[in-house]
């Protein structure tokens, strides 16, 4: 009974995928012109976002480089206008991304270089803008500085370790001033290097962290099309839905979140590991002997790819732990190649687990931070996130109790709903791992669904967490239902999610900026209605079927 349910569940998930034609017809001249205009429309949006961030972004409390500069300081004096600019720019970029979808999912598609140019064009304006949508980067600076001073960032927070009057602590939100670091030692080790390089210069440190984000995005862009090719998905389709997703520009590039590095290392590691597992030659060449020639070294290439992939995935978990799920699906793919037996399962899990523990031990020892991160994984649970269904249910139940006069039991219900959510995550992930082990599900698809379930049932969900699932699934899932749902979620969260720096604005300012942005976008649509592909492109007229030439004796029997 259980086996049949597993087969049915894994089969229903497997139906999200269907092979696509990797090569499609190129765009015609009219479509290329329309695509370029659309790309420019989106780039204009990111420029507006960057300008608006001078007033509406998450600027530092001290060492603000725009302070006192006549032109650059103007947006901070008209914050509602600045918020309108960032909101309008984000909507323009999201709509341009949506319009580009017809040139990546249709019968004629953009080339890889055209999509890469779009990605770079939309990224550049945000690289020099102040942080947006989050102040987490200032927590990164403070926690790294604590480590530089020789203190343990997993025991003390910025207020205790640096003092309330420190330049980094002043820019950290009050909620996080007393909390220890919830990030892995690799990320804090990188932060230590940045702090040692830049000292207490906030602007230089922020730009260095944005450079780290850019490296992570580069790894994402490198790995996603290769994983898509491995799964039988068109490269430009996967790149458009994943790395070109508006949430990546808004929250990873503009928001400077370490998810970029986590996802980049995880996806690159998954690609290398699967490259070794899917190789035609054996993983372990026989007989086992030290290679003495180039040909013999090449026989070890599949094993080298597998080990390199496992190391990269383990490194990604030392930025944020959820990416370690990828190693589980790689282990199941390896066990399936070895026959899917219990022995193969044990050997693959043991060997890859040993590599992972070795990498963690080396990073913990080299950084001097050890394994203290294991005790701060629940730090973010202090946030009550409405995007998390378990948390939302608890908050709603607590409010019902208050209305009925039963008291506020939100905290108690939170403990129950979050525990149930974690239990459901463990069941879902175990189910998916077994499906990959039996060969019913591709490991990339299993990883994407597992991360999607983790985000959905996680105690705390932030808008950028959605990219954990969207990017790997973009390389595997092709069904219109999945892509349509992903597009809808992206637009809803991207447009109606958090403002550029929501804690600084009143409800009146947010409402006014939203209305002004809506009017501005509608005017832009009206002005560009005939120049941009707002309407579906008409299908080319069908050619009438050619009549076959009559045979010589076609009318032989006619009177």
Curated annotation (Swiss-Prot):
Gene ablation phenotype (knockout): Cells lacking this gene still synthesize lipomannan (LM) and lipoarabinomannan (LAM).
Membrane-spanning residues: 41-61, 81-101, 202-222, 247-267, 300-316, 321-340, 355-375, 386-406, 419-439, 455-475, 480-500, 507-527
Positions of region (Disordered): 535-559
GO molecular function: glycosyltransferase activity
Record's keyword annotation contains Transport: no
Comp. bias regions, Pro residues: 535-548
Topology within the bilayer: Multi-pass membrane protein
Subcellular locations according to the entry: Membrane
CC terms in the record's Gene Ontology section: membrane
InterPro entries: MptA/B-like
UniProt EC number: 2.4.1.-
Keywords: Glycosyltransferase, Membrane, Transferase, Transmembrane, Transmembrane helix
Known function: Catalyzes the addition of alpha-(1->6)-mannose residue.
Membership in a protein family: Belongs to the MptA/B family.
NCBIfam families registered for this protein in UniProt: MptB
Listed name of the protein: Probable alpha-(1->6)-mannopyranosyltransferase MSMEG_3120/MSMEI_3041
């Amino acid at each position: 009974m259980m086996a049949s349910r597993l087969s049915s569940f894994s089969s229903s998930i497997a139906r999200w995928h269907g092979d696509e034609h990797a090569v499609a017809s190129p765009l015609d001249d009219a479509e290329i012109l329309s695509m370029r205009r659309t790309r420019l429309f989106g780039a204009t949006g990111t420029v507006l976002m960057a300008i608006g961030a001078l007033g509406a972004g998450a600027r530092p409390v001290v060492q603000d480089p725009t302070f006192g500069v006549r032109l650059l300081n103007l947006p901070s004096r008209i914050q509602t206008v600045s918020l309108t600019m960032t909101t309008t720019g984000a909507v323009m970029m999201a709509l341009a991304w949506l319009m580009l979808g017809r040139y990546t999912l249709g019968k004629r598609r953009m080339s890889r270089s055209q999509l890469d140019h779009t990605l770079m064009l939309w990224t550049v304006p945000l690289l020099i803008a102040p942080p947006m949508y989050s102040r987490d980067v200032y927590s990164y600076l403070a926690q790294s500085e604590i480590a530089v001073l020789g203190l343990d960032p997993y025991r003390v927070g910025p207020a205790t370790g640096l003092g309330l009057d420190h330049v980094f602590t002043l820019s950290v939100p009050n909620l996080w001033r007393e909390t220890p670091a919830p990030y892995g030692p690799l990320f804090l080790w990188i932060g230590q290097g940045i702090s040692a390089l830049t000292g207490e210069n906030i602007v230089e440190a922020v730009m260095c962290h944005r450079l780290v984000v850019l490296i992570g995005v580069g790894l994402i862009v490198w790995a996603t099309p290769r994983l898509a090719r491995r799964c039988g998905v068109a490269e430009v389709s996967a790149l458009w839905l994943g790395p070109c997703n508006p949430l990546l520009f808004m929250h990873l590039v503009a928001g400077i979140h370490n998810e970029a590095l986590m996802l980049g290392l995880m996806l690159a590691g998954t690609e290398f590991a699967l490259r070794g597992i899917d190789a035609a030659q054996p993983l372990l060449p026989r007989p086992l002997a030290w290679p003495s020639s180039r040909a013999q070294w090449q026989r070890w290439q599949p094993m080298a790819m597998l080990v390199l992939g496992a190391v990269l995935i383990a490194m990604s978990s030392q930025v944020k732990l959820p990416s370690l799920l990828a190693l589980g699906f790689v282990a199941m793919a390896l066990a399936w190649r070895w026959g899917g037996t219990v022995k193969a399962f044990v050997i693959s899990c043991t060997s890859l687990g040993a590599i992972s523990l070795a990498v963690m031990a080396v990073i913990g020892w080299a950084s001097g931070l050890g394994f203290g991160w294991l005790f701060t994984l629940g730090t973010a649970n202090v946030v009550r996130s409405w995007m998390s269904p378990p948390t939302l249910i608890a908050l709603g139940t607590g409010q019902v109790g208050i209305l009925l006069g039963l008291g506020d039991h939100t905290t108690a219900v939170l403990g129950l709903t979050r525990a149930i959510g974690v239990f459901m995550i463990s069941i879902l992930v175990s189910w998916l791992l077994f499906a990959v082990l039996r060969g019913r599900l591709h490991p990339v698809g299993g990883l994407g669904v597992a991360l999607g379930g983790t985000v959905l049932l996680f105690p705390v969900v932030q808008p950028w967490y959605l990219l954990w699932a969207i990017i790997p699934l973009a390389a595997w899932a092709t069904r219109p239902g999945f892509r349509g749902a992903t597009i809808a979620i992206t637009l809803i969260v991207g447009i109606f999610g958090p403002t550029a720096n929501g804690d600084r604005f009143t409800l009146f300012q947010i409402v006014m900026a939203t209305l002004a942005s809506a009017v501005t976008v509608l005017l832009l649509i009206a002005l560009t209605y005939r120049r941009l592909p707002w309407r579906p492109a008409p299908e080319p007229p069908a050619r009438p079927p050619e009549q076959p030439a009559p045979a010589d004796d076609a009318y032989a029997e006619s009177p």
